Amino acid sequence: MTYARIAKSSRYLSEFAVSNDDLSQIMETSDEWIKTRTGISSRRISQQENTSDLAIQVAKQLLAGEDPAGVDLIIVATMSPDAYTPATAALVQAAVGAENAACFDLSAACSGFVYALDVAEKMLRRPGGMALVIGAETLSKLVDWQDRTTAVLFGDGAGGVLVKNDALEPHFLASQLKSYGHLAKFLSAGQTSPQPFPGPVTDLAPFKMNGREVYKFATHKVPEVITACLEEAGVGLAEVDLFLLHQANYRIVKQVARRLDLPEEKFPCNIAEYGNTSAASEAILLAELAEEGKAQAGDLVVLAGFGGGLTAAAQLVRL
């Protein structure tokens, strides 16, 4: 019997960076105001690229040296797809020539990558099989650029992993996927009209968030799902090498570390440079750490997300 493992990670971000000072030219804000509240200094904005373009770049990097025909599954976690249909994953499939892959998008907002990784691990049962799990977002197309409470938070980007079913021992050790639909009103984007014939299709509703309620939710529920995940695996908090949290707000990450009574050094952050990239953030962070040699084979890692739904998720993996 063989088991699934993360064989490779990758990321892709536009080179076009927008600083806090740049934003202060178009809205009432400042570098100090943004950094103090979020830890964000800059974010990447994709000017001429769709979500699928970012995901395709990641997929091509992940499949370098691999046979695309051997890919069984492609999941793209996103809340900003190119279109309602076709799925972004189908566009990725066509671009990389993975003609044998089942393809679909998964929408769980900023928990999406952790959700998708868990789904892929459970679906990938063929020995030697491969899956692409990608988080990709172009949230710059969804935010209201006159609303400083949300526009300053988000950036565009993509990250992903190649999952292979070829390990001789389990690498995906436990997971917790939670949803709290009664809290849905606190974070929303892209609503369509409830009327059947409202006239021509217009722009989707912009991103809206009750920041205070989301902060309270994240700082309470993320420690809960992480603790439950580790209890399921029989692993202690101190045994984990890295906690890769959704990069929404530096203050949230610090507070989660504090609630778990763990050193902040175990909770790396790159939000200062990239902002909140939603479903892409954990994958981007993992790929960046792997490139720097800070996340290595054998490391015990928790991936955790939280976001719209509201949702919270944690996955314990051995790299």
Curated annotation (Swiss-Prot):
Its EC number is 2.3.1.180. It comes from Lactobacillus delbrueckii subsp. bulgaricus (strain ATCC 11842 / DSM 20081 / BCRC 10696 / JCM 1002 / NBRC 13953 / NCIMB 11778 / NCTC 12712 / WDCM 00102 / Lb 14). The active site is at residues 110, 246, 276. This is Beta-ketoacyl-[acyl-carrier-protein] synthase III. The keyword Transferase applies. Pfam families: ACP_syn_III (PF08545), ACP_syn_III_C (PF08541). Belongs to the thiolase-like superfamily. FabH family. Homodimer. The lineage of its organism: Bacteria, Bacillati, Bacillota, Bacilli, Lactobacillales. InterPro entries: ACP_syn_III_C, ACP_syn_III_N, FabH, Thiolase-like. GO terms for biological process: fatty acid biosynthetic process. The keyword Acyltransferase applies. Residues 247-251 are annotated as: ACP-binding. The gene is fabH. GO terms for molecular function: 3-oxoacyl-[acyl-carrier-protein] synthase activity; beta-ketoacyl-acyl-carrier-protein synthase III activity. Catalyzes the condensation reaction of fatty acid synthesis by the addition to an acyl acceptor of two carbons from malonyl-ACP. Catalyzes the first condensation reaction which initiates fatty acid synthesis and may therefore play a role in governing the total rate of fatty acid production. Possesses both acetoacetyl-ACP synthase and acetyl transacylase activities. Its substrate specificity determines the biosynthesis of branched-chain and/or straight-chain of fatty acids. Keywords: Acyltransferase, Cytoplasm, Fatty acid biosynthesis, Fatty acid metabolism, Lipid biosynthesis, Lipid metabolism, Multifunctional enzyme, Transferase. It comes from the Bacteria. It catalyses: malonyl-[ACP] + acetyl-CoA + H(+) = 3-oxobutanoyl-[ACP] + CO2 + CoA. It is found in: Cytoplasm.
